[in-house]
């Protein structure tokens, strides 16, 4: 049976965001306040970091800074790296993630499952060492550092989407 081309099927990118809001039912003390929480774990890569990862890559694409096939580089300790690995895989980018060796094996497995190349620095070097290596790789022409810690497109993912939701 042929697939109906007129039906639009959602992509992974379409599934980032629009996470449910839930009312927190048990608040300390006697209050009539209503507190809501966003279930960001419902994003495809499972965290609040899916939005900024998609934003950082999509905004760089829209500026023409990157095109599919390019190599992206990022220092990470976990969830941002997982989200970037997912987005890079979907959009056709190679991704090098640099992280301290003492991060969880589960996170490393997920990043690799999405196709990211992992480069570990010593635990002593930590995130500073990971960032420095990322910048060194970029200087050698090995790819573009997304630089989540100072990239204005990182919080834009929440400002433009999470907030209005």
Predicted regions and their residues:
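PLP-dependent amino-acid enzyme catalytic core
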Residues: 1-165
